[in-house]
Amino acid sequence: MRIITLIAIIGVGIVYSNTVAYAENSKTPNHIVVFPVWAEEILLELVDTDCIVWVGHPYLEEAETYWPTMKDTKEICGSIWQETDDSEILKLSPDLIICPDELSGDYDAIFPNLSKAEIPVVFMKQPETVLEIIESIFTLGNVTHQEQKATELCNQFQLEVEKLEALRRKIPENKRLTAVLNYEFQEDFQLVADMTGIINLLQEYDSYMEVSDDLIDELTPDIVVELNVCLDSDGIYLPEQGNAESPYPVISINLHPSQYIIQDCYSIMQKVYPFLFQE
């Protein structure tokens, strides 16, 4: 496995490079393993469902209502990487593996059977900005040989981002609302805050922190944002409903940094800034 640089030329004229660990494969992959949910959501816009043989979560029927790809992956094997037996994946004859970049240093130890099989691997950093989402779409388009579909997806995503930005600019500064994400992993929420014009009261805190009712009461946000479905080292599960007596309005979103983040942004803006949609 060697390091190469993938160059992505974006439809709006921006050029990026994304360096990933990737073993070159001239054949179009059709037995893909993808662990990050956000990458799964992008891939399902680029390749047929039957080209994916393993995803980074088990099936959860209750999540079909919320996750745009849960129903699509119903018949696909899956588990969180912490609970994955790579010998089971090997039986599916994978020809491309998409992993989160934090596993790159320990990949051989975590997945010894896959490592010995020398299956092409892409280690991808989770996007934190709109531009990084676009870059990730192009990277996945490149490694799956679906560059044209990736270009079309990026162009559509960029148009939706521009529509959101036009709405965000209409929000008077004195009407921007404050918000707290009621979940310990905070790094993805700032992107949504930036795109919707809300003020993230936990922006200056660590990316991982315990969020308690006492902390929320101390910060007194205008709204509390919760996740529809949680996916972490404990598995996949629906979170407990918020405190019914809470004085703060609650909005639930998915918070996956893929093209579907647009849906999260509209969900928030329609509820907290309804005047933007009354024309």
Task: Go through each PLM region and give its residues.
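Extracytoplasmic ligand-binding site segments that recognize negatively charged/polar headgroups
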Residues: E62, G105-A109, K125-T139, P172-D194
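Short secondary-structure boundary segments
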Residues: P36, D101-E102, Y183, L227-L231
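Basic- and aromatic-lined ligand-binding clefts that recognize polyanionic substrates
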Residues: T28-V47, K149-D206
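A short, structured surface patch at a secondary-structure boundary
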Residues: H31-L92, L96-G105, L201-Y205
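Bacterial N-terminal signal peptides
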Residues: I4-V15
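Boundary at the C-terminal end of the N-terminal hydrophobic targeting segment
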Residues: S17, A21-A23
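Structured C-terminal subdomain patch of bacterial secreted/periplasmic proteins
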Residues: N30-H31, C77, T84, E128-N142, ...
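Short, solvent-exposed loop/turn elements at domain surfaces
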Residues: E40-E45, L60-T65, C99, Q186-L191, ...
